[in-house]
Amino acid sequence: MTKARTMETLRNYYSLPGFVQESEDVTRLHYLEQFGLSEADLQALPLRPENRAYVDCMINAAKNGEGEAECIMACLPCMLSYGWIFQKMLDRSPAVRDTLYGPLVQDYAGPGYADACRAWAAYAEKVCTGLSPERAARCRAIFHDCSVHELHFWEMSAKPRTDL
């Protein structure tokens, strides 16, 4: 909730963890149980280098930025990529709904998540309107850098772990 200056900002910050807690978390916990794993098992694993670099980039953007514009630019690529990727998957292969991962796909391709993405994008537009040219450029750079890390995150998911 770093650098939040208004209640509106706090509400927007809380909306993403709210989705995770209410929807994605339930689905993820179901998968863990199904595969005989626990949340503690996952938490004990070291972050992969791609994840560590991404997390560090996001934290640095929030810590070193002037306020909410930098924070949201660091978070938005993650949120938008999930919605876009899972919606494309569903559009191309509707039968994915009937697979093991159908519930996960539906979490991110559903109307509730699409609404949340639109709300976050609108909020980003609002907090980035009127920024100085220098700060706007920094925000674009943060969005770009985090988008590149998001791409590496998705690429990483196709590579088996070699560090365990």
PLM regions: where:
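Hydrophobic residues within well-ordered, non-membrane alpha-helices that form the packing/core
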Residues: 31-32, 83, 124, 128, ...
